[in-house]
């Protein structure tokens, strides 16, 4: 029996907001001068008419996914909007339709299906099915090709390009304005939070370099399309990522390509969704014939498709940029293994480059919203700790502990699982983004480094979301 009176009891108390009639976004109505006597008729099927001297059908009010992304009404639960557009069900539907078109010989309508796999969800699936990372990658490639994939790619080339662009952006910013802290941009949960909560104050701090997912989208829809001799709109590009926020990122208007007349990434699924797809078929990853991942970018393939970037599990931005900046800006060499010093908790750490008692560089890694909020508040108060660069990730422990990674199956604590995934990650060979593959991509596709084309396709912009001052967002 409830110990609260009926008048005081609250129900459905949670922070998850799904699309419904309770959407708080006010609809803009274009008003025109009307004469007396106009009449609006609403029929049983929802048809609207305005009659005066004749009839005119009124426009239907629509709230789109883009409205939800551009609305300040909710932050943490916009993923609910994407249930139909960014789901395993939609993916399987597209794959079935494509197989039917192939069988009918309707080649003009057949789409080239491309999957891109990020290393973090692959680690999660490798642990789940007790496989090495290489084995998991090859079995997953076999599974996806059986579903209908034409190409199964890794994110290595995009990871490398993101590091190269971000480090150059930092050096340029440092030389122009050393006082402005630069914050990483690869985490869409963090970017969405910054746009909706802190707006124009924090956005100038965020790097403009696109995330590896969106760089991969450009390469698939433009470079791969060019190599295949097809339009980018005839490619259906799916990414497998460690968190649901990547679905939001793929849906941003900034990542709709006028060149290909399509989104750079059409669908995002996650490690946990891959597990659910396998469970629905009562199968495991090991049951599928192993296949090699594809490498369509350069004539010579890399030694391995799966690499680690520095020692951090979220792309290695802070460590790589620190090493590069130390050499480029101050001609200082750094150790191969950098030692970040943990501060109040293991999710906030820093490193300094000092010479003759003077701090030349001060970088940090901030994972989890508690640390992000503390960092932003210090910047707002003008009491920032003097970091020139901060690698920011919304999830505690970073991308390896993304919200859509496979859950522990034996009552294991998430922290213990994360540590095991970190150990798997450390077994991977280290990637140096300065390699023959990135140099060839820059030369052949981007017309060189630091060009207008590379700036357009490898960078993006951010948009402060205006706060909605409306009583519609108050629920009593």
Curated annotation (Swiss-Prot):
[4Fe-4S] cluster 1 binds at residues 23, 68, 71, 74. Pfam families: Fe_hyd_lg_C, Fe_hyd_SSU. Disulfide bonds: none annotated. GO terms for biological process: iron-sulfur cluster assembly. Keywords: 4Fe-4S, Iron, Iron-sulfur, Metal-binding. GO terms for molecular function: 4 iron, 4 sulfur cluster binding; metal ion binding. It comes from the Eukaryota. [4Fe-4S] cluster 2 binds at residues 187, 243, 395, 399. InterPro entries: Cytosolic_Fe-S_CAF, Fe_hydrogenase, Fe_hydrogenase_lsu_C, Fe_hydrogenase_ssu. The keyword 4Fe-4S applies. PANTHER family: NITRATE, FORMATE, IRON DEHYDROGENASE (PTHR11615). Component of the cytosolic iron-sulfur (Fe/S) protein assembly machinery. Required for maturation of extramitochondrial Fe/S proteins. Belongs to the NARF family. This is Probable cytosolic Fe-S cluster assembly factor GH10760.
